[in-house]
């Protein structure tokens, strides 16, 4: 493959601009099932055009076509975000009103911006890597964590939240977004991991140091313990814990946790049942040397937390959130400090695992034992 294939995918994604404009005007004249059929046809044509772009030398990695289609939908989501902010008009108005009204929520607004910016950049990078036959395993795992986190919160939130009674046929367009990332995740994970050619002496010296002689790791351990407590606390709030402390926190710090849209409640439960076990596992990995799985699960978790905290912070402060559920003005500094710190911690841990992996590399003796 040549670099022109990656450029072609970029241009193909930009075709979403005229396509959404025409689609919006057609959607206003047809029923919901017709809209779903046309949308599915458009996505199929995008995949077909991506295949035409690389007809002479098709990629070895079939995920090229997945990223091409998802890149197109990322531009669509960016258009939705811009239209919701009143920057543009007439592109997705009817679809937002009749197709997926839950995208009009503050949370829906934020995930549109995340998909249209962060995910879009990841797709372009991964497409370029495939075109140049380079590995993209690191950014691929980060993307897997990010998109699966958005699906795990957004799809159930649409069903159990206040828009649950307004589920339209367009909801079925979420099926590819649910299935394809899982398939992609397995393919990316099974790609060859990076080989670290560190001398045995360097690895042994790094692994011989206990936690007290690794100040950065010690700081991470302390932060992970605090983050675990924070996750459990907000999870209890999501489960309607009657404790006075939970009531006060919800009332004066994060009233958004009680938003009837249900996204924040599901997000806190995901943190409780997904992040807490991860934090415990990461604590083990930072104490016991040779845990070669640490970089991979850390990347996946870092991607998920980046998406989740961006959406949660943005929705908590967004004007589309009812005033009674927005973060009070006097609580904003503490709210931002806690939530930004919680979102940054997994990124620091991922940086630690990827760029200084000596502590997590298995020695040859350990590999022989296995």
Curated annotation (Swiss-Prot):
May function as sterol isomerase. Keywords: Lysosome, Membrane, Repeat, Transmembrane, Transmembrane helix. The keyword Membrane applies. Residues 60-185, 216-350 form the EXPERA domain. GO terms for cellular component: lysosomal membrane. InterPro entries: EXPERA, TM6SF1-like. The gene is TM6SF1. It is found in: Lysosome membrane. It is a multi-pass membrane protein. PANTHER family: TRANSMEMBRANE 6 SUPERFAMILY MEMBER 1 (PTHR14568:SF10), TRANSMEMBRANE SUPERFAMILY 6 MEMBER 1/2 (PTHR14568). The lineage of its organism: Eukaryota, Metazoa, Chordata, Craniata, Vertebrata. This is Transmembrane 6 superfamily member 1.
